[in-house]
Swiss-Prot record:
Interacts with sdha within the SDH catalytic dimer. It comes from the Eukaryota. Belongs to the SDHAF2 family. This is Succinate dehydrogenase assembly factor 2, mitochondrial. Keywords: Chaperone, Mitochondrion, Transit peptide. It holds the Pfam family Sdh5. HAMAP family: SDHAF2. Plays an essential role in the assembly of succinate dehydrogenase (SDH), an enzyme complex (also referred to as respiratory complex II) that is a component of both the tricarboxylic acid (TCA) cycle and the mitochondrial electron transport chain, and which couples the oxidation of succinate to fumarate with the reduction of ubiquinone (coenzyme Q) to ubiquinol. Required for flavinylation (covalent attachment of FAD) of the flavoprotein subunit sdha of the SDH catalytic dimer. The gene is sdhaf2. GO terms for cellular component: mitochondrial matrix; mitochondrion. Residues 1-17 form a transit peptide.
Length: 158
């Protein structure tokens, strides 16, 4: 009886190993080799449009939310801390620049690379707000920035 169980396990593992090469290419995602470009699916994003007639307090709240809820943790931390420090003191033109900066690019990594001066910033995003973000990113005060700030600072009753 004992040897039959061992034999069954050996046979099962051999069968799995022999089937693995036919199953893995379907399940495994990795190098595509020389696959032609049309097989890549690109989901089009709607183009960014400035919200005309939006009240400044509503815009600040929306930008705070959008600064905190990014597609990558690095930008969540960086932009939420930046928004905490600067958003309430920004002028209307600065808010428009910031809105365009965080919402128009389709790739969050681009924003991160521009803010950290890893890649050159396109002319359309160059401006006062980008300069403020780049300076903030340098972290000259050597603050520990490991997480997005709590929202307690927004509670005006405290």
């Amino acid at each position: 009886m004992f040897s039959a169980n061992i034999a069954r396990k050996v046979v099962c593992s051999v069968c799995r190993a022999s089937l693995r090469p036919t199953v893995c290419p379907v399940v495994y995602r990795g190098y595509r080799g020389d696959a032609p470009e049309p097989t890549i699916l690109e989901i089009p994003l709607p183009p960014w449009q400035e919200r005309a007639g939006e009240a400044l307090d509503i815009k600040r709240k929306r930008l705070l939310y959008e600064s905190r809820k990014r597609g990558m943790l690095e930008n969540c931390i960086l932009l939420s801390l930046f928004a905490k420090q600067y958003l309430n003191t920004m002028s209307e033109s600065q808010l428009k620049q910031y809105d365009r900066l965080i919402n128009e690019p389709s790739n969050d990594w681009d924003i991160y690379y521009w803010a950290t001066d890893t890649q050159p910033t396109p002319e359309v995003y160059q401006g006062e707000v980008m300069d403020m973000l780049k300076e903030f990113t340098k972290n000259r005060d050597m603050e520990q920035r490991l997480d997005a700030p709590n929202l307690e600072y927004l509670d005006k009753s405290s």
